[in-house]
Amino acid sequence: MAMSHVQPMLLLLVSLFFLPALRGAIDFEYCAKNGNDYGTVTSIVVSPSVGPHENPTITINLFGSASKNIPAGTLVYVAFRDGEFTGLLKTYNLCDVSACNNEAEIEAGTNFELTLSDVLYVGYDEEIKYSVSLRRKTLEEEDPIIKMCVDFKVPAPAPAFVSI
């Protein structure tokens, strides 16, 4: 029985459309010389923007592996950069966005996930980068010290198809 050439081509074409969506993770890089005192980031997944057109939000899921204990008092900052301008979008307490509790920390040698919800979506532009940083407040420093930081671009929203 001869196999039609149409079926394999159709399968290839369909897979080209769906495989990138199934992958979900986006490219990221560590910020400047700071980066990974607390461990490594393994992937970042950004959900599509939701909410009213004038105030859409996204959810950022950051997955990582802790090489040191990450204290419960750690702060998580989400910011965006457009050229030289940096704007703070949201600040979270670590235990509000992870599996730790206020008495415990994320222990060294464990994997963790940060779920950063209701982050303002500032729109798509090739120059805009989002940044997620873990910061530790100390008595000696006025501003919290960056212990882990990654930059990434939020992908352009996929076009919506509407049939009538």
From Swiss-Prot:
Q: What induces it?
A: Induced by the diamond-back moth Plutella xylostella and the generalist herbivore Spodoptora littoralis. Induced by jasmonate (JA). Induced by wounding. Down-regulated by salicylic acid (SA). Down-regulated by ethylene.
**Modified how:** Neddylated.
Keyword Phosphoprotein recorded: no
Segment forming the signal sequence = 1-24
The family database entries (Pfam families) matched by this protein are listed as: E1_DerP2_DerF2
GO BP, one example? defense response
Q: Where in the cell is it found?
A: Vacuole; Endoplasmic reticulum
Keyword Ribosomal protein assigned? no
Keywords assigned: Endoplasmic reticulum, Plant defense, Signal, Ubl conjugation, Vacuole
One Gene Ontology term, aspect cellular component: endoplasmic reticulum
Q: What happens when the gene is disrupted?
A: Semi-dwarf phenotype.
Q: What do we know about how this protein assembles, alone or with others? A: Interacts with RUB1/NEDD8.
Function of the molecule = May be involved in herbivory-mediated responses. May play a role in herbivory-associated molecular pattern (HAMP) recognition. May function is jasmonate (JA) signaling in response to HAMP. May play a role in defense response against the pathogens Altenaria brassicicola and Pseudomonas syringae.
Q: What is this protein called?
A: MD-2-related lipid-recognition protein 3
Q: Which organism is it from?
A: Arabidopsis thaliana (Mouse-ear cress)
Identify the coding gene.
ML3
